[in-house]
């Protein structure tokens, strides 16, 4: 095993409680670096909605939480470079590499496998190299759960299953503007162009802005919903039209825009309101709906011509998800195969400056001071729980 520095034996981490909340834990064991893993010293972490929801779904004490991180590789398992070299775009890892990625936090099968800590044992498939010029906070905000989950929703079999050969072509091109997607005006949409329109509900979320970018790169025409104050934001990330989800006529406006021909919708929220609006916006012939949350059955039963699905990003680790309340899932080898091809592709797009980060808000001291980062994570998770974060990604610096 290659190692850069001597790691401590214990660390501070943010862990789950039996009551479905979070707490700071000191003296936690620093995970070892398995033969197919890399050990990363964490520099910054990003907070996601799933981070505050997971403790209630596992109802277990002492699981390290957190998904998205950026940091420095300090050790590499002897087989850690084998699997990435079998990917479509091969990569390798070495001590000292600056990386960003995702782990399956709050994981009953791997209690120490969470990002809200000082060190994390990471799956090399789910990592990307940090581009030159990016700081740790920007890298953590991109992480891996957002672009991975969104890509699986958009392009994965059984979900929207959109064609992304155009996106791959752009990644293979050395020119930053080699392929462009000039979306037509709605009044001039042909039938084929109408089938390229995709609704992204929640376009001002981190998942939303990522979806807008990926859709444009893949040659689709994204429309979205958000508050009017965020119309400029979503348009800057690629939306060709934005609709106010507060409006009683929102679904009607989208049906008019798409001439009742919308066939694909990505729901970044997955609640009753968002699902109902997506279903109402889809055209008379139905289509596909995919959510980043388990959608309500009361909505999915309303239209038989709509094929619904929902995605949990951790399925891309190829492991069983041991969760409560209907969220448990068996190991998904197809999702794992998708991840093997997707993460190297995403890395290339990031390094080519074709994908950019969501707006970042730094939470906690910067530069970090002692263990105050852990308290900052707890405060940030409460903000997410309260719904007080809008059009921004909370990022906490962990180490200088």
Curated annotation (Swiss-Prot):
Matches recorded under CDD domains: enoyl_reductase_like
Family: Belongs to the zinc-containing alcohol dehydrogenase family.
Molecular function as annotated in GO: nucleotide binding; oxidoreductase activity, acting on NAD(P)H
The EC number(s) this enzyme carries: 1.-.-.-
Organism for this UniProt entry: Acremonium sp
Pathway: Mycotoxin biosynthesis
Quaternary context: Monomer.
Protein name in the entry: Trans-enoyl reductase ucsL
